[in-house]
């Protein structure tokens, strides 16, 4: 019996793409910062001249899937991370955006076999979002760690 697990120390040669929603950028910029910190601490070159990392900004979380899909299909990335923050308002818009973003990101991973980390905060208030993006903890760091684990795991699995 084989057992497969991703490792966090296997970042050499890993190409990472990050798609960040600009809407609620007070939150998403902090998520990106935490994510980059994690990747850097685990050996990914996050410099402006990096050949290991690309970051794409989109208007909002609804647009995350289409850009993630394009990045996955181009064959240059072993793992993708989507970052966004959708905060509940007084209309059903929240439910529509969250449902479509989550389904879309999941479909990209299924259709392309490229792991796509769903790093979209879904909160009731801005305060809750800020707490998850740096005041109490930074989930961006966790999303970076998940990407490292999944990138490593996918490299370890037998290919079709």
Swiss-Prot record:
Catalytic reactions on record: (2S)-2-hydroxy-3-oxobutyl phosphate + 5-amino-6-(D-ribitylamino)uracil = 6,7-dimethyl-8-(1-D-ribityl)lumazine + phosphate + 2 H2O + H(+)
Record flagged with keyword Transferase: yes
EC number: 2.5.1.78
Binding positions (5-amino-6-(D-ribitylamino)uracil): 23, 61-63, 85-87, 118
SUPFAM superfamilies: Lumazine synthase
CDD domains membership: Lumazine_synthase-I (cd09209)
Pfam family, one: DMRL_synthase
Pathway: Cofactor biosynthesis; riboflavin biosynthesis; riboflavin from 2-hydroxy-3-oxobutyl phosphate and 5-amino-6-(D-ribitylamino)uracil: step 1/2
GO CC term, one of those recorded: riboflavin synthase complex
Record carries keyword Transferase: yes
GO MF annotation list: 6,7-dimethyl-8-ribityllumazine synthase activity
Matches recorded under InterPro entries: LS, LS/RS, LS/RS_sf
Residues reported in the UniProt entry to bind (2S)-2-hydroxy-3-oxobutyl phosphate: 90-91, 132
Annotated active site: 93 (proton donor)
UniProt keyword terms in alphabetical order: Riboflavin biosynthesis, Transferase
Biological processes, Gene Ontology terms: riboflavin biosynthetic process
NCBIfam families per UniProt: lumazine-synth
UniProt record similarity statement: Belongs to the DMRL synthase family.
Role, per record: Catalyzes the formation of 6,7-dimethyl-8-ribityllumazine by condensation of 5-amino-6-(D-ribitylamino)uracil with 3,4-dihydroxy-2-butanone 4-phosphate. This is the penultimate step in the biosynthesis of riboflavin.
Designated name of the protein: 6,7-dimethyl-8-ribityllumazine synthase
Species whose genome carries this gene: Synechococcus sp. (strain CC9605)
Gene field: ribH
